[in-house]
UniProtKB/Swiss-Prot annotation:
Protein name as it appears in the record: Resistin-like gamma
Superkingdom field: Eukaryota
Predominant cellular place of this UniProt entry's protein: secreted
Single annotated GO MF: hormone activity
The protein's assembly and partners: Homodimer. Heterodimer with RETNLB.
Disulfide bond sites: C55-C108, C67-C107, C76-C93, C78-C95, C82-C97
Gene: Retnlg
Role summary: Probable hormone. Promotes chemotaxis in myeloid cells.
PANTHER family reported in the protein's UniProt record: RESISTIN, RESISTIN-LIKE GAMMA
Source species: Rattus norvegicus
Keyword presence, Secreted: yes
Pfam families in the record: Resistin (PF06954)
UniProt record similarity statement: Belongs to the resistin/FIZZ family.
Amino acid sequence: MKTAICSLLICIFLLQLMVPVNTDGTLESIVEQKVKELLAHRDNCPSTVTKTLSCTSVKATGRLASCPPGMAVTGCACGYACGSWDIRDGTTCHCQCAVMDWATARCCQLS
């Protein structure tokens, strides 16, 4: 009987902890208010930095395709449906299949 009463009291206590409490200063309401304030004043803080992402594809015969200077590989494609490739030095695609007729590197530059 004592364990049943203790269990009941523990359950009631836990249920009280789960009941939502309305407070003006919850973290969610504070964050929401700050976001609204920032969005309302975003015209006062124009960005002075503009970046452009320019990309191109470089296709080569064989296993390797290299990007032009200043560009980095963001993806590779290989002939004969080869899906096994790696990027060497951040600028070259290397197709790893045994027989390979072409390789393509997707090269991008942030300027």
